[in-house]
């Protein structure tokens, strides 16, 4: 037998500023299943994580709540830890980036980069809040859009017209924190020389460390040229002060990934068998894997490996990227009851049902995963209760009643047990490749065969026939052995079911290797229900509990519309005459391509077909469409005669039309079926 592998695994660090929701849980469940599989196979697999506990947002929320940042992150960590534990996510260590280990390692890495010439400084001009005595990030500045005059817009992008601009272009700027008028000030910032690692990154990202789709996206960024990365923030800031630079702090994304190392170092202090340098030192032969979402690929596939390389540390063996979660085919929505917190789910349903559903849908790619609540109920009830647990419930009673709970030594269908045995390597390969969906399909196919065998032999009918009790015992003993095999294959996904099954089977904790043997002349414990069907009423109750309160009344002035409708929130604009309207050329447009804009928080770049020509349009709809490829092939409406506007990212040749207040609530408009690209909208 080969030596056990030594593997260190991490998930992205949850931000210590809010609750965990089911979108977050997708990643932690995915990672936990892979880690449990490795341990199931006998490998030494360590799973560490931490709360991402630094940044202005945490500092400001703590101030608003009248507590210290340290109190806030301690409260959030307790909440996160409970959610993870109750979802059966089993970390070897869950730490915090606000720790002595992280301070020490962040300083060490920074000094190594600085001493190697990879840190530069230059002056940056930013808005400064004179009341709060702090520099303002773009999201903390609001004012009037310089393009369309919409009020209350962010410092870099207008959510109403989609325009982008520098914060200094904003009219009547105000601090979103204090309401004060900001002033421009210069400040020394520190930059990591990312372009110096261009050749290294081009090689590393094509060395098998990334999925092909991710490597291709990274190649686009590399081909467009890397920029120096600003790694500093000015006081006041909740984080670590940069060594030898009073009043200057590490940007949260500098010390956040170092939190992986810090959590492991904290564990090493309690585990003498673990050697920190064996996992993080240059040339380490152990394996290191990061599981992340596709929204933070640039930090993990560009900045992080470059930092490690520059600091003379090892780089990851692999970065495993997953897609976003949708619910019922749409982005999670509070108003629809599909923005579901982890705790809200746990208040209504067992964790293993969601673990199995995620496993049944998770492939090895970066495609988004949809949690369809009707399909969720059907799949769990059909697969787990109707197939897997059903085998044990069908057979256990006959063994207890007819043979005092002792399984006879008999293999009533060798070809069936051989099929289970020969399927194991393929299921293991699927787990290893993170193709959980294939592992579940192949396991359920075996469950179907086991159920078909039991249905064919019908022990309930045999038991009524004189002299056929030995057959009943042989059939049911085989059924229990096949159930045991299925539990072994499902244990990384369903650890509680496995533990309950082990008690019923009266066996030690099952390992993967146990699939090669059968129980014979073995005493079972009394059987009790291992799982119950999902009642759709509980799913409905969960959705109801997730809905935000939409019944608040509006207290606007008498001239405002009554109630809390859209006109109350966004009153009608001043009237225009028909000629003004007729001057607007509205056209049907086909979205040929939709993609993220590097460096822009809110923009998507759309390539539009309007009949005889193509247009390039930048639109501030990214928050509502985080997976822009979903828009490709869709018809929309655009203002085609809007004067082209030069933007920081290129020329925008028009404006697409959308409704909604902004953020996640943006809805791109589409014409009725039958409309063709280029047709005028009248």
From Swiss-Prot:
Source domain of life is Bacteria
Q: What detail does the entry give on cofactor binding?
A: Binds 1 zinc ion per subunit.
User: What cofactor(s) does the depicted protein rely on?
Assistant: Zn(2+)
Q: Give the residues the record marks as binding Zn(2+).
A: 145, 148, 158, 161
GO annotation, cellular component aspect: cytosol
Gene Ontology BP terms: methionyl-tRNA aminoacylation
PROSITE patterns reported in the protein's UniProt record: AA_TRNA_LIGASE_I, TRBD
| Family label | Belongs to the class-I aminoacyl-tRNA synthetase family. MetG type 1 subfamily.
Q: What does this protein do?
A: Is required not only for elongation of protein synthesis but also for the initiation of all mRNA translation through initiator tRNA(fMet) aminoacylation.
What protein am I looking at? Methionine--tRNA ligase
Per the UniProt entry, what species is this protein from, by scientific name? Pseudomonas syringae pv. syringae (strain B728a)
> What is the gene name?
metG
């Amino acid at each position: 037998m080969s030596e056990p592998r030594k593997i260190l695994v991490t998930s992205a660090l949850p931000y210590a500023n809010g609750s965990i929701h089911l979108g977050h849980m997708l990643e932690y469940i995915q990672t936990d299943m892979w880690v449990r599989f490795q341990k199931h196979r006998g490998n030494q697999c360590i799973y560490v994580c931490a709360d991402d506990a630094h940044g202005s947002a945490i500092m400001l929320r703590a101030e608003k709540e009248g507590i210290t940042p340290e109190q806030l992150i301690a409260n959030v960590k307790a909440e996160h830890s409970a959610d993870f534990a109750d979802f059966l996510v089993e970390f070897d260590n869950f730490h915090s980036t606000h720790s002595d280990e992280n301070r020490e390692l962040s300083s060490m890495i920074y000094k190594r980069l600085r001493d190697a010439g990879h840190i530069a400084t230059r002056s940056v001009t930013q808005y400064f809040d004179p009341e709060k005595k702090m520099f303002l990030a773009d999201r903390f500045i609001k004012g009037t859009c310089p393009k369309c005059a919409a009020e209350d817009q962010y410092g870099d992008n207008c959510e109403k017209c989609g325009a982008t601009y520098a914060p200094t272009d904003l009219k009547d700027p105000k601090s979103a924190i204090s309401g004060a008028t900001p002033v421009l000030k210069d400040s020394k910032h520190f930059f990591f020389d990312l372009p110096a690692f261009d050749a290294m990154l081009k090689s590393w990202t094509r060395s098998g460390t990334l999925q092909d789709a991710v490597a291709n996206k990274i190649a686009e960024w590399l081909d467009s040229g890397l920029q120096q990365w600003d790694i500093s923030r000015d006081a006041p800031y909740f984080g670590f002060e940069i060594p030898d630079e009073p009043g200057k702090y590490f940007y949260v994304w500098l010390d956040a990934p170092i939190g992986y190392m810090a959590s492991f170092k904290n564990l090493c202090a309690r585990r003498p068998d673990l050697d920190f340098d064996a996992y993080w030192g240059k040339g380490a032969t152990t394996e290191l894997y990061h599981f992340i979402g596709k929204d933070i690929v640039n930090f993990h596939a560009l900045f992080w490996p470059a930092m490690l390389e520059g600091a003379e540390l090892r780089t990851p063996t692999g970065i495993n990227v997953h897609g976003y979660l949708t619910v019922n085919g749409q982005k999670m929505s509070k108003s629809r009851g599909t923005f579901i917190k982890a705790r809200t789910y746990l208040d209504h349903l067992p964790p293993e049902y969601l673990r199995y559903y995620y496993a049944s849908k998770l492939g090895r790619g970066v495609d988004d995963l949809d949690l369809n609540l009707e399909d969720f109920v059907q799949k769990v009830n059909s697969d787990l209760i109707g197939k897997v647990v059903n085998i044990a419930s069908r057979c256990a009673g006959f063994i207890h009643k007819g043979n005092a709970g002792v399984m006879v030594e008999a293999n009533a269908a060798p070809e069936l047990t051989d099929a289970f045995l020969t399927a194991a390597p393929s299921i293991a390969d699927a787990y290893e490749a993170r193709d959980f969906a294939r592992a579940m399909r192949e396991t359920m196919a075996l469950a179907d065969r086991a159920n078909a065998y039991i249905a064919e032999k019908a022990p309930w009918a045999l038991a009524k026939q004189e002299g056929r009790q030995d057959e009943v015992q042989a059939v049911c003993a085989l059924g229990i052995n096949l159930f045991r095999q299925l539990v072994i294959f499902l244990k990384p996904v369903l650890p509680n079911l496995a533990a309950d099954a082990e008690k019923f089977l009266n066996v030690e904790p099952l390992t993967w290797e146990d699939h090669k043997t059968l129980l014979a002349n073995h005493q079972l414990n009394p059987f009790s229900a291992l799982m119950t069907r999902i009642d759709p009423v509980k799913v409905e109750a969960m959705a109801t509990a997730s809905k935000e309160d939409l019944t608040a009344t509006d207290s606007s002035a008498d001239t405002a519309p009554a109630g809390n409708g859209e006109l109350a929130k966004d009153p009608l604009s001043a009237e225009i005459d028909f000629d003004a309207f007729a001057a607007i050329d509205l056209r049907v447009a086909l979205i040929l391509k939709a993609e993220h804009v590097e460096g822009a928080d809110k923009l998507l770049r759309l390539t539009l077909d309007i009949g005889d020509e193509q247009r390039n349009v930048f639109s501030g709809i990214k928050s509502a469409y985080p997976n822009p490829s979903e828009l490709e092939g869709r018809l929309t409406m655009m203002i085609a005669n809007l004067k082209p506007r030069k933007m920081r990212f290129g020329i925008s040749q028009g404006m697409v039309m959308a409704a909604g207040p902004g953020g996640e609530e943006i809805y791109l408009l589409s014409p009725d079926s039958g409309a063709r690209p280029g047709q005028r909208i009248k």
